[in-house]
């Protein structure tokens, strides 16, 4: 075992990396309320794992979507548990995100020199809510269909660009297969990729600047 470790140490300087991570200064005022951001990341990883598992059975079709979700819940081994964990962790992710934003705001963590960290965090909040909006409609039941119709119709109230935005979101004049395909693509590829990039940027900034001091 030591030989394996020494082999990696010689090439990657693993110990130096470990020392850098473990020796980072943590201010004495940090408490449990500073863990909300890490819990958001934990929920995101759970979402990725459970969501990936369901992609093997889910069919993004207006004809088959509901039946495929029903199949996951009733016929796939532990499918009901995987989908339930996905739903619960989604709700928990939104809750932890809201608490994290409030904690950062109330403790002044958005002030100079951490303005860009705050901007990436707020952008991540928008991405998190977008996860909920797109995922809610994927079962394509009555609730999902009408939620999709209402959400995609909201931009119509915006002058000039409203109607084109509605067409882009729906993929046509009305809600249908193109809309479901867009929501599925956004939920399983576009938003996870955006979240991963933003989280990495967010954490690197925190790593560089450290945790903000007390008020």
Curated annotation (Swiss-Prot):
In this record, what's one Pfam family? Answer: Cytochrome_B
Q: What's in the keyword line of the UniProt record?
A: Chloroplast, Electron transport, Heme, Iron, Membrane, Metal-binding, Photosynthesis, Plastid, Thylakoid, Transmembrane, Transmembrane helix, Transport
What are the transmembrane regions?
32-52, 90-110, 116-136, 186-206
Query: Which CDD domains does its entry note?
Result: Cytochrome_b_N
Broad class of where this protein is predominantly found: plastid
Residues involved in heme b 2 binding: 86, 187
**UniProt-annotated binding residues for heme c:** 35
| PROSITE patterns for this protein | CYTB_NTER
Show the PANTHER family listed in the entry: CYTOCHROME B
Subunit structure as annotated in this protein's UniProt entry: The 4 large subunits of the cytochrome b6-f complex are cytochrome b6, subunit IV (17 kDa polypeptide, PetD), cytochrome f and the Rieske protein, while the 4 small subunits are PetG, PetL, PetM and PetN. The complex functions as a dimer.
HAMAP family tied to this protein:
Cytb6_f_cytb6
Report the protein name in the record.
Cytochrome b6
